[in-house]
Amino acid sequence: MTMRQCAIYGKGGIGKSTTTQNLVAALAEMGKKVMIVGCDPKADSTRLILHAKAQNTIMEMAAEVGSVEDLELEDVLQIGYGDVRCAESGGPEPGVGCAGRGVITAINFLEEEGAYEEDLDFVFYDVLGDVVCGGFAMPIRENKAQEIYIVCSGEMMAMYAANNISKGIVKYAKSGKVRLGGLICNSRKTDREDELIIALAEKLGTQMIHFVPRDNIVQRAEIRRMTVIEYDPTCQQANEYRQLAQKIVNNTKKVVPTPCTMDELESLLMEFGIMEEEDTSIIGKTAAEENAA
């Protein structure tokens, strides 16, 4: 099997890291060889696989020894549940420098040190928030990741983020092979959520690859720094992640997305009752003017 490189994007706080690690645990359980590369300065992309608070990052270790050239692969790569290989890029202190540079430096280091030559089936990049700036777009800009999955929900801001990320994919698809593999709905239990994300996926020219229901067992597993797959392999939520993993294994629908205009997106949100039609008659009016009317 040719190694598949996938990047997971989505709004900050949507559950990307949790979804990615549970998905990866399910792939490992299926016998797939997987590596996770955390592309977020928080360095929380591997904690459930490693049962750790946060893995030491490539950028932290490079600062300690002098430069990234002084590091060895075994210094930065840890093995976790199901023999999953884990690396965290890290970044500078908050307010200092560009964290995206850390992603670029880390991925280049892993490539040069042969981390990708280990007979891998999948590499997953867990990428910071909905930022598609130069550094964080690096996994797609440099043709590292060729498959993008966007984690979203039926909440308005999560859908805005999915649309913005799709715009970024279009930009880089013109010069490379990057494609959108689908939307993963990480449910927030909003009204008609699955229908809404299916409709959004249709607008974007893609698919909702799986609807992950909300279940408190995810939080119970997280408190123990474990994936649901490892914590309670017999529960229904573990089966949801297995289904997601199988759908990604079988996925052949990878597209250049067709992002919505803001008007189209707002029309969709109004159609599903997420957003009310704007009352244009009140725009620009002061309280005094409204009271006088």
UniProtKB/Swiss-Prot annotation:
Its cofactor is [4Fe-4S] cluster. It is an enzyme of class 1 (oxidoreductase). ATP binds at residues 10-17. The modification ADP-ribosylarginine is found at residue 101. The keyword Lipid biosynthesis does not apply. Keywords: 4Fe-4S, ADP-ribosylation, ATP-binding, Iron, Iron-sulfur, Metal-binding, Nitrogen fixation, Nucleotide-binding, Oxidoreductase. Binds 1 [4Fe-4S] cluster per dimer. The keyword Repeat does not apply. GO terms for biological process: nitrogen fixation. It comes from the Bacteria. PROSITE patterns: NIFH_FRXC_1, NIFH_FRXC_2, NIFH_FRXC_3. [4Fe-4S] cluster binds at residues 98, 133. InterPro entries: NifH/chlL_CS (IPR030655), NifH/frxC (IPR000392), Nitrogenase_Fe_NifH (IPR005977), P-loop_NTPase (IPR027417). It catalyses: N2 + 8 reduced [2Fe-2S]-[ferredoxin] + 16 ATP + 16 H2O = H2 + 8 oxidized [2Fe-2S]-[ferredoxin] + 2 NH4(+) + 16 ADP + 16 phosphate + 6 H(+). Its EC number is 1.18.6.1. GO terms for molecular function: 4 iron, 4 sulfur cluster binding; ATP binding; metal ion binding; nitrogenase activity. PANTHER family: LIGHT-INDEPENDENT PROTOCHLOROPHYLLIDE REDUCTASE IRON-SULFUR ATP-BINDING PROTEIN. HAMAP family: NifH. NCBIfam families: nifH (TIGR01287). Homodimer. The key enzymatic reactions in nitrogen fixation are catalyzed by the nitrogenase complex, which has 2 components: the iron protein and the molybdenum-iron protein. This is Nitrogenase iron protein. It comes from Klebsiella pneumoniae (strain 342).
